[in-house]
Design a protein with these regions (language model features):
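Gly-rich Lys/Arg/Thr-decorated short loops/hinges at beta-loop-alpha junctions or inter-strand turns
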Residues: 99
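Active-site acidic carboxylates
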Residues: 1-95
Length: 99
């Protein structure tokens, strides 16, 4: 059996104090609860045990054609120019060291 660790949505826009989702409180929660370091530690342990590492992230192309317009969380991403793929916003945070 193959084992894996799945890391979801640990992108700058969501968990960084400089991200556009700062007002939602995700970055503050992550900071107050040491989420990034705890996740980095879990990732390091998983790698040492030869787990497959899977990073999943949300993001939209420049024209936002994939954006779910009725989504409570992502419905206004285009208006705020948030979550653009291939930018700092949708890069996995440095703490997690994508390899």
């Amino acid at each position: 059996m193959t084992k894996a660790i799945i890391i979801c949505d640990f992108i700058n826009e969501i968990v960084s104090q400089d991200g556009k989702f700062k007002g939602k409180g995700y970055a503050s929660f992550a900071e107050q609860n040491n989420v990034l370091q705890n996740t980095a530690n879990a990732l390091e342990k998983a790698r040492s045990l030869n787990f497959k590492v899977i990073f999943v992230k949300i993001g939209f192309s420049a024209d936002y054609k994939e954006q779910p317009k009725n989504s409570l969380l992502f419905g206004k991403a285009d208006q705020f120019q948030a979550l653009k793929l291939d930018t700092w916003a949708t890069s996995i945070v440095d703490t997690l060291k994508v390899e």
